Regions:
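ABC family nucleotide-binding domain
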Residues: 4-5, 10-181
Length: 181
């Protein structure tokens, strides 16, 4: 079996002054390469928290998360960051585009960090596929919400990652662009 991701009894709790808030409770999940999975639930049900855990941006209270058969819950932040940089693309609900970088620069940065050839050209080709050819040199503040979302998606998939985590990936897109993505 080509297991890409495995969660075993993953729990996430937050402690406030008065309460313990259980966000995720004994989550078990196994995915294979090329699987497409949707996690659906009410607002506040833990979907974003699950993405943050899988992406190594937050630590589980307990349980294990394996990515490509490696227990990422036992790794240092730097080691998890390296895995994320090379193998995981994340589309956040808030796009987190770099405000003083153009659309091309926001996408090319991922490619540059991974020392790929022609990052600017690759970024332009990807953005062109997403209908943003006339927006290459625009800053995020000069883009609509839907355009920013397409830049964020292009950035997440630029490295052709093994795993793409997307939090409401088409939330700001019209129906035509949702289908295109």
């Amino acid at each position: 079996m080509d297991t890409l991701l495995k969660l075993k009894k993953v729990n996430l709790k937050y402690q406030t002054d008065k309460d313990t808030i259980k966000v995720l409770n004994n989550i078990d999940l196994t995915t294979k390469k090329k699987d497409t999975i949707s996690i659906m639930g009410e607002s506040g049900s833990g979907k974003t928290s699950l993405i943050m855990l899988i992406g190594g941006l937050e630590k589980a209270t307990s349980g294990k998360i394996f990515f490509r058969d490696q227990d990422i819950t036992s790794l240092s932040e730097d080691e998890v960051s390296e895995i994320r940089r090379k193998h995981i693309g994340i589309v956040f609900q808030s796009f987190y585009l770099i405000p003083n970088y153009t659309a091309v620069e926001n996408v090319a940065l991922t490619l540059e960090l991974n020392k790929l050839k022609n990052p600017q050209q690759q970024a332009k080709e990807l953005l062109d596929r997403f209908g943003l050819k006339n927006r290459f040199n625009n800053l995020p503040s000069q883009l609509s919400g839907g355009e920013q979302q397409r830049v964020a998606i292009a950035r997440a998939i630029a490295m052709k990652p093994d795993l793409i985590l997307a939090d409401e990936p088409t939330g700001n897109l019209d129906s035509k662009n949702s289908v295109m993505i």
